[in-house]
Every structure is written in C-alpha cells, then in structure tokens.
C-alpha cells in the first residue's frame, strides 16, 4: 500500500490519499501526539472513517516500535550491569517487567459509534488497510453474542441478561465454562479481524461463549470497537472491564453526541413500577414463609434474608407514598421541579449515597432469584427491580460534591401516568392487602385515591457525561462526523478543551452536485411544511406534483425525506386518494420506510433490486429515521434527494421546552452556548444534513439536492447547513421558479452522464471478509441490467453492452446493499456467517456473464461470435407489472452449449452443463460442501493474496484452483471462478482452461475466445 508521511508519521493508505484526507489525518495525528482533543468534520463520502483508522493506528504502530526500542535498550542496560549489580539493575529489571506487562507508554484506541451497524462498517474498512493485522475486538450485547439456546428463547434483552447471569453464576452455562480453555485457540486468537458475526461463528464452532470470550481480548487489543453506551455508562465500563487511562477515545458519527450524553444521565420511574416491585417483594416473602422456597428456588442457600426483604419493602412503600404526594398542577403537560426533588423522594424512603451500592446489589440478587423461580411458576422475572437498580445507579452517580452543578443541569418533570398503565398499580394494591401480614401501614398508602405518576429525571447538560470521561485520564478524545457544524456551540455544550478543529470541504467537484431551493411547486403553490400548512390540501398536492416532475427527470434512485412519520403518512394517503401516487408509480416504483426491523430489511432489499431496472425507484423516508442515519445510496442507488421540510422537534414537548429554557438560563458571552431558538433550529438542520449525506458518497459520485421548503431561504437556516452545501447556494440563497429548475436539472443529469465516469470495477480494492447475504431457497435472482428509457444518451447504451457491471466503484469504501443486509443481521437461510466471504467485494452484481468472451465489451459486435460456449443472458425488464412478476418466477437462465465442452464423459445425447451459482453466498456454500476444510482454507488464503496484484499471486491462485477444482465434476466451479478475476488475468485463465480440457477430454476442444 502507498505510504505517506503525515505529521512525521508514516501512514499506509489503500491508495494515494486526497488532500482532504491528508488534512484530516494530520489533525488526528497531532491530537494523538500532543494528547489533546479534536472536533473534526468531514462530509460523508470523503473517506473519514478510513482516514481516522489509518491515522490513529499508524501512530499507535509507531509508538509500539519506539516502545520496543526502549525495551531493548533497557534490557541491554540491565545485562551490562550484571545480575545483582545493585539497585539500578533491579530497577531496570522491574521497569522492563512492568513495561512488558502493561505495554508501557503505548496508548490504546477505543472506537465508538452509535450502532453496531456503523461499527461493522468501520471494521470492514479496517480489513482493507495495512493495519488489518493489529489486535482488535468488538464488544456486543448478550442479545447479539449469546449462543445458549435457552437464553436466546427469552423475550426482551433484560430477561436474556438476567438468565445469562444466572447460568454463569450457577455454573450451568457450558459455553461460558469453555472460555478459559478455548480463549487461546488459533481460530479465536488469529490475526483476522472479527466482527459480531465472526465472533458468533467462531463461538459456535468452538462451543465457546462469544460474549465472555470477547472480553478476554480487550486487555491485549490495540483497538476496541464498541457502541456509545458501553463507553459513556460507568456501569457498562465496569462490567466490560474497560480501562480508559492513557486511552484514545474516538467518537464517530458524533453529531448526536449531545443527546446521547444527556440520555445516558437521564432516567425515569413510574408509580406502577414501584407498585409492581412491592408486589414482587411480597411474593418472595410469602414463598419464604410458606416453605415453598425449595420448590421455587432450589436447594441453594439464598443470597438475601427475610430481614433484607422486609427492609426493602418498607423502603419501597415509603417511596410509593412520596411519589403519590407529589402535586401535578397541570395533568396534561405535567409539572417541573428542581433536581433536588428526586433526592428528596429517595431520601424519604431512605435511599442514600451511603446505602445505594448495597441496595443495588440486593436488587440484582432478587432478579437472579426470580429468574430461577420463573422456571417453576408463573411470575414476573424482576424487570421492575432492574428499573429501580438503574434509577439508583444513575441518580447517585452524581457525587455529593457537585450537587450545585447537578441542580443547574438536571430537572425533575412529573407527569400523570395514563390510566391503562395503572393496572399493575391496582394489582399491587390488592397484593399488599392480601399478602404478607405484619406491616400495618401496607393498606394505608393511599394509592387508590392518588393518580399514578411518572417521575422523569432529565439531564440537559451533555458536558456531564464528557466530564466524567475526561476524569478517567484519557489521552485524547476525537469527535468526528459528517455533520458537526457549527463547531463552536458543540464544543461549548460538551465543555471539553479542544485544540484541533476541522471543517473539511467535500471531495467532489462543484459540477458533480446540483443544489436548489424549491420554494413553489409546479402550480406556484408555496412549499412550506410548517405546522399551519401541513393540513393544507393544496400544499400536499403541490408537493406531490413536485416529486412527480422530479421523478420524470432523475435517473435511477430518488430519495424523499419527510419531517416525521405522521407527515409522511398524511401525504401518502392524500396522494393515493388523488391519483398522484399512481402517477409517480408509473415513473418509478415507490417504497416507504417501515418501522419494523424485519419489514425494513426486506423493503431495502426490494428497493436495491428495483434500482437495477431502468426506471429506478423512489424511497420515501423520515429524517432521523434508519434510512437517513446509516445507509449508503451511492451511484445509481441515489441520484437525487428531496427534503420536504425541516424536522423541528415538537415545540410543546416538555423536554424540548426545558432544554430551551436551560440554554437561555445558562448562556453567557464566555461559554458561547446557543440560544434556545438557535438550538431548536440546529436540531432540525443537523437531521437534514444527515439525510442529504446519503447521496454523494465518493469522489466519482454525482447527484442533486432539492430543498423543497421555502424556509431554506432564511440566512440563519442556511448557515447551519454543512459547509460544502452552503457553497452551492451562494451568499444570498433564493428559491427559483419551478420551470427553470426542471430545465437545469435535466441538463445537469445529461451532462453528468456524458462526462462523469460511470461505476466500474475497482481494481485496487482489497478483499473483505463480509458476512455473505444468504438468498431465499427456490427464488431466481433477477439479473440486473443498466439500461435507460428510450432517448437517453449513448453512455448508458454503451454501458449496457458491458459483460460485467457493478453498482459501486468508490475509491473510498462505503455501504452497499450486501453490506446493509449483513449489518442488519438478516439471514434467510440457516448457514452460519462466513468469515471467508472474500468475494463480496471482488466484483458486484453481475448483469451479463459470457464465460467465453475475452474481447472488448465495447466492440460493436460484443467481441464474441455465435460459437460462444456458455453465456448467461440478461432478462430485459420493461415494467414492474404482473407480467414481469410472472416472468421473474418462471423464466430460467438460458445457456448456449457447445458440443465439445463436457463435465464428464456422457453419451452423445444433449446434456446441459452444470453452471456455478451466480450468488457469491451460494457459490461459497457449494464450494465448501464439495471440498475439505483444509482445501477451503488454502483456497481462501490464496484468493486474499491474489488481491495484492502480482502475477506471482495469480500463479499461486491457479495452482490451488487446478489442484482443487480440476476434476471433471468440479469443472463448473473452476469456470465460475473466472468472473472473480481481474481483467488482465482472464485471457490467461482461458488458456489454462482450454489446456485443461484438451488434456482431459478425448474430443478436440476449442479455446474460449
């Protein structure tokens, strides 16, 4: 890989870095070198994640080398002094021992992001770098990593956690018991980077718990990947053995970091939660006194006593009474109190700083007990105890010596609990009246006469979480995202010292992006999605007409983002009633973002499939939804994005009101906090920036950004857009009439298709071991084509003749449809995820494979005559109608067969040649089922080495292929490998294949052209 010296550090990058990437890596290295913090913005598609990983790990590797040199010198000094030569020699020996044990002076990297999907993407980026052999680990939840069949049957993450803890504590989990003996197994400690799916696969193979095994890797890892909550939650850090001293913290996708910090310090408790906890304690006490304990909990001695339960019940009853006594002046919106109210409520029930840890430990023991008891009787599994434990942990995490800051940063908001939530409350009251006797005040708590309440303990100062992070003596904190601007207010809110700032421009040229504000629709109706106008049928109709006209012009994928789900649903209903929906569907099939995970995954796959049709597709989604936050719509998947409105938070929401009030109260000239209104506007604009970032994904990408809300003309609103977008709008952005925009948009795409490089195979890309997408058994994959409506320019007509097409040609790796399917964890078959899915990036979706043609795809006749031996034909699609659907189900692949190609000696009767599966996943599964494990491992190794690009590697690959696949019954797989080779090696491959046929077949064999 090319090496560049950046800020004095040699950095290996998969290709020659662009200037924006150099600038970014320089800032990262300076932060690490000086032990300072940085806030770095670089637009989506500029290679931010790749630059971040390469720069940080290059610096770590340099420090490791320096450390090794220091240890060698120290060892040499110790030898010169001789054994027992005095205090100096002993000190050197001690220092050397400590240095070896603690990797003395070499920091480690913690890479945190919002979701595991984003972490998987980062790990895939790391796999294609020169630092792929550095020690890494990813931390996941039990829900993702547990392989115990009984635990996985549990509904809800908390139940899985508690049952897992129970089995580990009782030493009845065989998977966890094998961790100690299997943790040094080569498959687990090997050099390859393992993501969540890889950990599960190895765990299943070794019958070892992936969850607990991953923790064994943390201490020795150079880089640890984890979600935000593992890092920001002190309890999670302790549970996962995460030490932050002398650590580099990288917070990627940090545009939501303020909210995440606030939410991690906030908590809620309901009256019904307390009532059900009382009922659960009462039930356990009844079991104790009735002699049922052995039947319910087994013969093991309990970790708690009847006195413990009595005391806890008294405390819970007092807490319930205290909550009931809180006055709610406004039953509709609730009443706000100072933060001190929470401490007063807990104090009345004798929950204090002094006994918090003891009570939390008791609650955890009770949860374990109920998990066992639930195996023998119908009973709740202690969810309310978990809620109480979280409440005490979060509230008392704020030390007594900072209570003045707590009172400024927190508020208590009390709401009336809905009546349908009070069933548990009334049930608890009955339980108290009929349950364990001896406490005369049980029936006098007054719960029946008081309205149940929700007590919210809300944090409005994100600096609280960041301050706790800095207090752990971390070396550096780097916050980065594509949409951090404006940086000053962000830094002010987080209250951390920042030495390095960066707002990178985009990597694309101005001519590759078309940005316009559309203030009126085709009928000159104002487009403004404010509260007053959202129910205006004229506005909704005009917006639909706008989308229809844009859909007629934009090729391939069109994304439409709405401010909220209610607005999306309102527009869909209106357009379906008026016929606009059908009109848009005639131009492009429409997909709507669903909320369910399974539906979402299948909808995305259908959308990506529809893009392969010449008409493309429309995807309607919501700002801040799943589509806007993590998916890649590069190249044809997204040629334009329409923003239909600004997604402001609900103005009357109590939390929004209190956040604005907090900013206004604490804002000074010195701290540069935003005003309440500025924060309100910025929250909406950042969501817009994220949605816009789905489209332009790499240097050769192009697309249009259409802001269909007249409020985007406001200077204050424009200033909060990303810097690279502002450059396209000018100093005084104004909306243009709809007619000229349509003409300009048509001209933009015509020019882009004529001048821009269309997606092609990326030769230098390194193989990735992605989890393969498993397709449904029995369905025929639609062979994609790149064809356009009649009248489009020659670029697409020429592209349609190509033998191999791919969807993405980014020099900067980003999400693809296959990546999305694996990140979502969706597998339709039962095959385990395959770490050897090294083919997933060697090419992409194939539209036409001619195994016999080595001529140019651009030649007039296609380069192959009628004597072609094996050809898989494209199926042209004209419309998504019923006829097409039937064709999809019934049309089989057609093959041209030559009489002199045989898989094995047969009679003279015509036989159809077996063809390698088209899907990479199916190809790998079939290959693995036919060869030994050692052969498959050798096959994977040489294929990975082949990607380094030398002819020697090609020879090694051919040697293994001929050894493994040369037999007549395996010949179809040998031929199928051709599509995964680089173009310069295909001719030689054809020669080898022809020679193989001549040597093993008795009949003459024509060389494949």
From Swiss-Prot:
It is found in: Nucleus. This is Regulator of telomere elongation helicase 1 homolog. It is an enzyme of class 5 (isomerase). A probable ATP-dependent DNA helicase implicated in DNA repair and the maintenance of genomic stability. Acts as an anti-recombinase to counteract toxic recombination and limit crossover during meiosis. Regulates meiotic recombination and crossover homeostasis by physically dissociating strand invasion events and thereby promotes noncrossover repair by meiotic synthesis dependent strand annealing (SDSA) as well as disassembly of D loop recombination intermediates. It catalyses: ATP + H2O = ADP + phosphate + H(+). Residues 7-322 form the Helicase ATP-binding domain. Its EC number is 5.6.2.-. Gene3D superfamilies: 1.20.1160.20, P-loop containing nucleotide triphosphate hydrolases. Disulfide bonds: none annotated. GO terms for biological process: DNA recombination; DNA repair; DNA replication; negative regulation of DNA recombination; negative regulation of t-circle formation; regulation of double-strand break repair via homologous recombination; telomeric loop disassembly. GO terms for molecular function: 4 iron, 4 sulfur cluster binding; ATP binding; ATP hydrolysis activity; DNA binding; DNA helicase activity; DNA polymerase binding; metal ion binding. InterPro entries: ATP-dep_Helicase_C, DinG/Rad3-like, Helic_SF1/SF2_ATP-bd_DinG/Rad3, Helicase-like_DEXD_c2, HHD_RTEL1, P-loop_NTPase, RAD3-like_helicase_DEAD, Rad3/Chl1-like. [4Fe-4S] cluster binds at residues 146, 164, 173, 209. It holds the Pfam family DEAD_2. Keywords: 4Fe-4S, ATP-binding, DNA damage, DNA repair, DNA-binding, Helicase, Hydrolase, Iron, Iron-sulfur, Isomerase, Metal-binding, Nucleotide-binding, Nucleus. Belongs to the helicase family. RAD3/XPD subfamily. One of its GO terms (cellular component) is nucleus. SUPFAM superfamilies: P-loop containing nucleoside triphosphate hydrolases. It comes from the Eukaryota. The keyword DNA-binding applies. ATP binds at residues 42-49. A motif (DEAH box) lies at residues 252-255.
């Amino acid at each position: 890989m090319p090496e560049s010296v950046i800020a004095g550090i040699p950095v290996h990058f998969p290709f020659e870095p662009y200037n924006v990437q150099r600038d970014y890596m320089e800032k990262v290295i300076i932060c690490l070198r000086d032990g300072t913090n940085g806030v770095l913005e670089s637009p989506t598609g500029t290679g931010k994640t790749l630059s971040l990983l390469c720069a940080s790990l290059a610096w770590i590797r340099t420090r490791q080398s320096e450390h090794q040199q220091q240890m060698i010198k120290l060892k040499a000094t110790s030898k010169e002094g001789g054994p027992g030569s005095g205090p100096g020699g002993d000190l050197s020996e001690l220092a050397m021992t400590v240095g070896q044990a603690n990797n003395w002076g070499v920091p480690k990297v913690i890479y945190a992001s919002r979701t595991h999907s984003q972490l998987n993407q980062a790990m895939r980026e790391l796999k294609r770098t020169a630092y792929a052999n550095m020690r890494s680990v990813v931390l996941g939840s039990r829900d993702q990593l547990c392989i115990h069949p009984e635990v996985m049957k549990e509904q809800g993450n908390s139940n899985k956690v508690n049952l897992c803890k129970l089995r580990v504590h009782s030493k009845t989990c065989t998977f966890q018991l094998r961790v100690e003996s299997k943790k040094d197994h080569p498959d687990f400690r090997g050099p390859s980077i393992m993501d969540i799916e890889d950990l599960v696969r190895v765990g299943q193979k070794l019958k070892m718990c992936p969850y607990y095994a991953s923790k064994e890797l943390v201490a020795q890892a150079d880089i640890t990947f984890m979600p935000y909550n593992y890092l920001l939650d002190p309890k999670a850090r302790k549970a996962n053995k995460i030490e932050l001293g002398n650590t580099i913290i990288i917070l990627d996708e940090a545009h939501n970091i303020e909210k995440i910090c606030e939410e991690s310090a906030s908590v809620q408790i309901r009256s019904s939660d307390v009532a059900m906890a009382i009922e659960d304690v009462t039930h356990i006490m009844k079991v104790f006194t009735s002699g049922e304990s052995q039947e319910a909990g087994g013969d093991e001695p309990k970790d708690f006593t009847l006195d413990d339960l009595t005391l806890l019940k008294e405390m819970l009853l007092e807490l319930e009474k205290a909550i009931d006594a809180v006055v709610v002046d406004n039953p509709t919106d609730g009443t706000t109190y100072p933060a001190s109210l929470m401490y007063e409520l807990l104090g009345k029930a004798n929950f204090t700083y002094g006994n918090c840890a003891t009570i939390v430990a008791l609650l955890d023991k009770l949860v374990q007990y109920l998990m066992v008891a639930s195996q023998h009787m119908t009973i709740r599994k202690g969810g309310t105890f978990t809620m109480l434990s979280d409440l005490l942990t979060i509230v008392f995490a704020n030390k007594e010596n900072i209570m003045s800051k707590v009172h400024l940063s927190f508020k208590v908001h009390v709401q009336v609990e809905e009546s349908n939530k009070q069933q548990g409350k009334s049930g608890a009251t009955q339980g108290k009246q009929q349950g364990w006797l001896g406490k005369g005040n049980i029936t006098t708590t007054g719960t029946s006469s008081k309205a149940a309440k929700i007590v919210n303990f809300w944090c409005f100062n994100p600096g609280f979480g960041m301050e706790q992070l800095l207090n752990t003596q971390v070396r550096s904190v780097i916050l980065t995202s594509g949409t951090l601007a404006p940086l000053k207010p962000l830094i002010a809110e987080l209250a951390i010292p920042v030495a390095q700032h960066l707002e990178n421009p985009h990597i694309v040229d101005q001519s590759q992006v078309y940005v316009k504000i559309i203030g009126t629709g085709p009928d000159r109706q104002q487009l403004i999605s404010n509260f007053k106008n959202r129910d205006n049928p004229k506005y909704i109709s005009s917006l639909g007409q706008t989308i229809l006209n844009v859909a007629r012009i934009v090729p391939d994928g069109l994304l439409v983002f709405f401010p909220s789900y209610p607005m999306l649903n309102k527009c869909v209903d209106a357009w379906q009633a008026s016929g606009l929906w059908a009109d848009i569907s005639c131009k492009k099939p429409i997909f709507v973002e669903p909320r369910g995970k399974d539906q979402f995954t299948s909808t995305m796959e259908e959308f990506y499939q529809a893009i392969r049709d010449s008409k493309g597709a429309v995807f309607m989604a919501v700002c801040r939804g799943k589509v806007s936050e993590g998916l890649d719509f590069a190249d044809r998947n997204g040629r334009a994005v329409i923003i239909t409105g600004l997604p402001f938070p609900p103005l009357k929401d109590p939390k929004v009101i209190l956040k604005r009030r907090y900013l206004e109260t604490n804002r000074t000239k010195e701290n540069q906090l935003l005003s309440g209104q500025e924060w309100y506007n910025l929250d909406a604009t950042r969501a817009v920036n994220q949605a816009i970032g789905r489209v332009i994904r790499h240097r050769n990408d192009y697309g249009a950004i259409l802001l269909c809300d007249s409020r985007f003309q406001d200077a204050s609103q424009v200033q909060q857009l990303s810097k690279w977008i502002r450059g396209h709008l000018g100093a005084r952005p104004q909306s243009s009439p709809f007619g000229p925009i349509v003409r300009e948009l048509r001209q933009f795409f015509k020019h882009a298709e004529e001048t821009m490089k269309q997606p092609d195979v990326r030769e230098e890309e390194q193989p990735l071991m992605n989890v393969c997408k498993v397709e449904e058994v029995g369905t025929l994959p639609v062979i994609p084509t790149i064809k356009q409506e009649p009248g489009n320019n020659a670029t697409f007509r020429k592209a349609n003749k190509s033998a191999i097409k791919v969807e993405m040609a980014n020099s900067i790796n980003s999400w693809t449809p296959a990546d999305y399917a694996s990140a979502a964890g969706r597998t339709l078959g039962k095959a385990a995820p395959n770490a050897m899915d090294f083919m997933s990036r060697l090419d992409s979706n194939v539209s036409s494979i001619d195994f016999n043609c080595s001529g140019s795809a651009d030649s007039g006749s296609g380069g192959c005559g009628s004597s072609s031996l094996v050809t898989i034909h494209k199926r042209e699609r004209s419309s998504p109608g019923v006829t097409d659907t039937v064709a999809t189900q019934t049309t089989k692949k057609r093959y041209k067969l030559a009489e002199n190609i045989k898989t094995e000696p047969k009679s003279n009767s015509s036989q159809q040649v077996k063809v390698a599966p088209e899907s990479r996943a199916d190809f790998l599964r079939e290959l693995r089922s036919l060869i030994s494990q050692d052969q498959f491992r050798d096959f994977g190794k040489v294929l990975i080495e082949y990607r380094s690009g030398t002819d020697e590697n090609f020879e090694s690959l051919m040697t293994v292929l001929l050894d493994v696949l040369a037999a007549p019954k395996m010949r179809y797989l040998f031929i199928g490998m051709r599509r995964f080779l680089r173009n310069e090696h295909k001719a030689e491959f054809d020669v080898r294949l022809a020679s193989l046929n001549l040597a093993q077949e008795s009949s003459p064999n024509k060389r494949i052209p």
